[in-house]
Amino acid sequence: MNRGVPFRHLLLVLQLALLPAATQGKKVVLGKKGDTVELTCTASQKKSIQFHWKNSNQTKILGNQGSFLTKGPSKLNDRVDSRRSLWDQGNFTLIIKNLKIEDSDTYICEVGDQKEEVQLLVFGLTANSDTHLLQGQSLTLTLESPPGSSPSVQCRSPRGKNIQGGKTLSVSQLELQDSGTWTCTVLQNQKKVEFKIDIVVLAFQKASSIVYKKEGEQVEFSFPLAFTVEKLTGSGELWWQAERASSSKSWITFDLKNKEVSVKRVTQDPKLQMGKKLPLHLTLPQALPQYAGSGNLTLALEAKTGKLHQEVNLVVMRATQLQKNLTCEVWGPTSPKLMLSLKLENKEAKVSKREKAVWVLNPEAGMWQCLLSDSGQVLLESNIKVLPTWSTPVQPMALIVLGGVAGLLLFIGLGIFFCVRCRHRRRQAQRMSQIKRLLSEKKTCQCPHRFQKTCSPI
């Protein structure tokens, strides 16, 4: 019995040694699910001779009878073919169309006294549920492979990111830059096959935007999409958080159907206007400090879980002059690195601070500029003209007092004049009345120099 053990070991070693020789010459071909593959078989004689293709179960797939193509009873019957034009050259190909994972097998070509074996491994790579995904969602790629295989997969995204894995690859938090063609390579037995998958990330072109406006100017908000779909249906809403308000509120709601926009509800203050076609476009009639703040536009697409988001910010500037103070202010979300300045035209800045309000006391006459800038780049500018003032601050008040006194004196003088004139007329009227009475009574008046001849009674 002890002598039998070494013999069995020797037999096993011989089998292992002979195994590579039995499989020597077997070619490995990788195919893609749904594609077409050509398995080659070349005869030593460059002429048309009889050949047969069989599977590992020795079931005939196809062959020839002279110049005619014959097919066997295999499950591939309606999906196989051969290039007859190459038979005369001793090339007898097996063409398998619309490959399936279950087509993975060892195919045997018998031509003349030759026998060739080709191992076909069919792989499939598919994306989870849909290739149209919302920004921020996860992408999962699943590899279908034949039993017994142990492939590795490496994918490269459009933005150049490499992902490696086995039969499942996952990418979380998709970004807009991930939209495009993904190239995935499957490796098996030192052979490789390449897949290309088109992924569309549904998103706005910009995650956020900021609009700078002077007080009173018209404001335009635009929300262009980063993708194109023939039939786009959904609904959206713009919520706004004003800087001066304690809570946010809905400014407008709308529906989207076949790229046409219809407004469902809009606030009266402010009363936004919305374009009727894509891209989504909103108009605010006037930029006012009470509207400065941040908004969030959401778009829910039909048959999609989740929403698209775009943040929009409004910064409003106001330049005012009140008595001796020239003020420049901004409202809305601004970066701490932004600089606010007040300067006289063509001169150096009088004041420049990283704050939301600056001012100048007793400003010189001329055109003043209120500037909001970032690293020297002017983002917003508002001009205000300061008129010349009096040399001393007392004179305007003195003129007002003097004017008031002069007006009062003139009023009193006119009153006295009219009063004296009225009194004089009344006295003159009394005298005339007295003269008439005396004349009617034939009495002399009290004026002897005029009526002395008629002073005595008749």
Curated annotation (Swiss-Prot):
Question: TM spans, by residue?
Answer: 397-418
Which residues bear S-palmitoyl cysteine-type lipidation? 419, 422
Q: Give the membrane topology.
A: Single-pass type I membrane protein
Q: Glycosylated residues: list them.
A: 296, 325
Stretches assigned to the Ig-like C2-type domain: 126-203, 204-317, 318-374
Stretches in topological domain Extracellular: 26-396
Which Pfam families would you find in this protein's record? C2-set, CD4-extracel, ig, Tcell_CD4_C
Q: Which residues carry this modification: Phosphoserine?
A: 433, 440, 456
Gene Ontology annotations of biological process type = adaptive immune response; calcium-mediated signaling; cell adhesion; cellular response to granulocyte macrophage colony-stimulating factor stimulus; defense response to Gram-negative bacterium; helper T cell enhancement of adaptive immune response; interleukin-15-mediated signaling pathway; macrophage differentiation
Cytoplasmic-facing ranges: 419-458
Q: How is it modified after translation?
A: Palmitoylation and association with LCK contribute to the enrichment of CD4 in lipid rafts.
This entry carries the following GO cellular component terms, namely: endoplasmic reticulum lumen; endoplasmic reticulum membrane; external side of plasma membrane; membrane raft
Q: List the disulfide bonds.
A: 41-109, 155-184, 328-370
Note on domains (UniProt): The Ig-like V-type domain mediates the interaction with MHCII.
Q: Which PANTHER family does this one have?
A: T-CELL SURFACE GLYCOPROTEIN CD4
This protein is called T-cell surface glycoprotein CD4
Q: What is the lineage of its organism?
A: Eukaryota, Metazoa, Chordata, Craniata, Vertebrata
As recorded in Swiss-Prot or TrEMBL, the protein's gene is named: CD4
